[in-house]
Amino acid sequence: MFKIESIKSQSPQVAIDKERKATKFDINKMFEFLESGKDEAALTKSLMQQIERDTILKTNASYYDLTKDQHRELTAQKIARLASYIEKDAPFFENFQKRLNLIAIVDPQLGTRVGVHLGLFLSAIRGNGTEEQFKYWAFERGAAYLKDVYGCFGMTELAHGSNVAGLETTATFDQKTKEFEINTPHLGATKWWIGGAAHSANHCVVYARLIVSGKDYGVKTFVVPIRDRNHNLHSGVAIGDIGAKMGRDGIDNGWIQLTNVRIPMNYMRSKFTKVTQRQEIVEVPPLEQLAYGALLGGRVTMVTDSFRMAQRFITIALRYSVGRRQFGAKNSSEELKLIDYPLHQRRLLPYLALTYALSISSFDLSQTYDSVLSNLDAAGKSQDFSKLGQAIAGLKNLFCASASLKSTATWYVAQLIDECRQACGGHGYSSYSGFGKAYNDWVVQCTWEGDNNILASNAGRLLCNLLSSCKKKEKKIKGDLSYLNGISNIDKEAICWNKQSMTNLSNSNIDKELFCFNKQVCTVKLINAIQGTIIRLGVRVPNIGSKKSTWDDIAAQRVVLSKLNAVLYMLQHLVLKIKQLGDEEAHKQYLVQIAALFATSQIEMNFASYFLQFKAIDSLEPVADVVSELCLSVRDQVIGLTDSFQFSDYFINSALGSHSGDIYNTYFDTVNNLNNPQVRDGKAAYSEALEAMLRRDPLEVRECFEKSDKVLKKLAPKI
């Protein structure tokens, strides 16, 4: 096909290649930093290569043209392929989890289809079931290997979502048969949005109210077979497809209604609650909160998903912004690159800094989750109340961190995807840019596994309660929230950070000089300012409004607290990781700038009013100025900083973001290869309707000349 070549001086390919060659650090070293170490980086590259080379897992531009049914069929084929990988990865299931996280970069619906089974179905059994029950379902029955048992997660109902305690499905114990009878008592109790239920799953972990001898013991979990070995529905089970959604059409979300479905009594998960054959209830109430520990894994994974998705789309937008030229200075024959406009820098580079901050926090949060889960298991087995207390404290801290980070990260990445789309102008609206499907697929992350507003307000409430305990000196907090102990050192009127970098809090573990970008702005002291703002806001929040104010009345402020806590977590972990690098590392200086840009841009864009209100800073002027300065400092290295993610074109899967930078040829070829205009001599299937419209007869002809002067004259009455 004939192509008109771009003017050489304005070739996107030449521009991107030139900036790539100007990278002043080793992108492999930066990749190792982002992947949390050399070994992890090697594993990531190996898994990405395996995924890309697998012809069945292949995803390309045609992915954006698939119908819902085509997505479902293709996803089923890919699930079958993944089943072989999980057998090979065993017993190192963490490798398969990483594989699944990487697949989700380009095919999130596939990641979800398998993730619901491994991450929700099995985690619910692990969290609520005994060790014997977990071993039976996971290994004897084969669920851990995607064999024989394929599970779904039956929590959400048509009339209840976040309020788990209000679920209305019932599980009534029958003393005569030693069985539970599961029922959907009315339409509102229909299990809804159940991923995999419509066509795939043959078992479901059902959250239902335990009824024994007429008494309601609250919501417990039960394994309910819903299809037989021939994949036919069991009697009493009604299932349907909930239909089209905004995105993730490859997931067969369904509804489930259960009518007098009987299961053996041992199908109830009984780690914390048991029903004896005498209808006696044995509960361990102090430990029941531990059951939700395993379910926090979904939120932790979504922070990793946020990092990966941010990597992909900030890369596309920044490559496009280097290759695309628009307008230009007077008396210049060459147009300016988009990235050279200060506004464009301010639109995109803070999101690049966010991506880097997400990298470290996602890995650290995953490690914390694994550690907490291990401690919970050990404490549960030992029945040592001292260890149990420590485990519960660790779980609370994990809940706060995961709730804050999941909600904040998924919100921010939704904003990132759309801002990157807008930054690519009209071409960003093309499906082949990748932005449209990605956004529609992504935004559900703000709702499932805990609605973001509810999660964030709950995390904010926990912060308020912890601050209250610290103020009363009831407890000393350890871990990431230990800064709350500084409440007694905070002068309510003193400025936490100003032009002289005065601070009321100290952090001796971090080299303050290293992270001072200039005389006005010091990243470490901005950390102190964030801590001070959280403490001051957290102390004041419970007292907002009248004495009769409820927690709901101050929910908006609790959400802000959660966001601040998430930003603090990301910034602290990024700074501590940078501190570990040697001064000779060439990429260190750019990481310092990125950390400073993340801190200052977050304050300027999202929290300025709170920092001023609570005197964390005395002026926004130095913050605003330094954001612009940092954008300029980072700007020249944007290609190297995004190449450091080491995403091949397979994982980018965008006509606008290929590694070569040949934007226009790639885009043109993609459009023409997938939309051949030569079908039926260039005519569309609906061409006849358009042609008939264009060739239609004049109105008077279509009206049979009934309103013509000649006819009207004949019909006129004679006077």
Swiss-Prot record:
It is found in: Peroxisome. Its main location: other. Its cofactor is FAD. It catalyses: a 2,3-saturated acyl-CoA + O2 = a (2E)-enoyl-CoA + H2O2. GO terms for biological process: fatty acid beta-oxidation using acyl-CoA oxidase; lipid homeostasis. It comes from the Eukaryota. Keywords: FAD, Fatty acid metabolism, Flavoprotein, Lipid metabolism, Oxidoreductase, Peroxisome. A motif (Microbody targeting signal) lies at residues 716-719. GO terms for cellular component: peroxisome. One of its GO terms (molecular function) is FAD binding. Its EC number is 1.3.3.6. Pathway: Lipid metabolism; peroxisomal fatty acid beta-oxidation. Belongs to the acyl-CoA oxidase family. This is Acyl-coenzyme A oxidase. It comes from Komagataella pastoris (Yeast).
